[in-house]
Amino acid sequence: KGLTFEEACILPEAFFTIWFNLFIKNKIKKKQKILIHGGSSGIGTTAIQITKNFGLEVFTTTRSKNKSIKCKKLGADHSINVKNVDFEKLVKNKTKNEGVDVILDIVGGDYVQKNINLLKRNGILINLGWLTGSIVKINLLMVMLKRLTITGSTLRTGSLKEKEKIAKELKK
């Protein structure tokens, strides 16, 4: 209610993308900590609501104070304006240097190594976009020592059968 036709049309893609990546492909668990980059984006706002309702502690990044406020209203526990603060340092501080279990990244570029730094042992980095670059240099030794999983996906390449499976899972 209150959405334009165009706005309503994009909802399934955001929900399907989040559900598939968090719960079907990566089996995210309650009480984990998640960092969602681009918290005020379509993917970000959807991810905040789903993960908060699922019982995760939610960190987000944005590029303005107003967007951070919006993310908090949607359920984010912590919203970081990256124009004013180094998200890596703040998340480390808020988690007492433990880091987070899962990161949803639509930014890419120089965020990727920072994400690797922030992930706990056996953490999962899910790449859903590359606003600042798709080609990156990372420390593979850190990936190996922390036993990290780096993954990503797009619905566009999925078959109709895969999308039907996601829809059925979401309906439950």
Locations of regions flagged by a protein language model:
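Local beta-strand N-terminus motif with an aromatic residue
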Residues: 31, 76, 99-100, 143
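Terminal peptide-recognition signature
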Residues: 18, 51, 71, 101-103, ...
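N-terminal Rossmann-like NAD(P) cofactor-binding module of classical short-chain dehydrogenase/reductase
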Residues: 35, 80, 101-104, 126
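Glycine-rich phosphate-binding loop and adjacent beta-alpha segment
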Residues: 54, 110-172
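NAD(P)H cofactor-binding loop motif with strongest signal on the N-terminal glycine-rich segment
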Residues: 38-39, 107, 130
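Mid-domain Rossmann-like dinucleotide-binding core that forms the NAD(H)/NADP(H) cofactor-binding site
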Residues: 8-85
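Short amphipathic alpha-helix with an adjacent loop that forms part of the alpha/beta core around
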Residues: 86-97
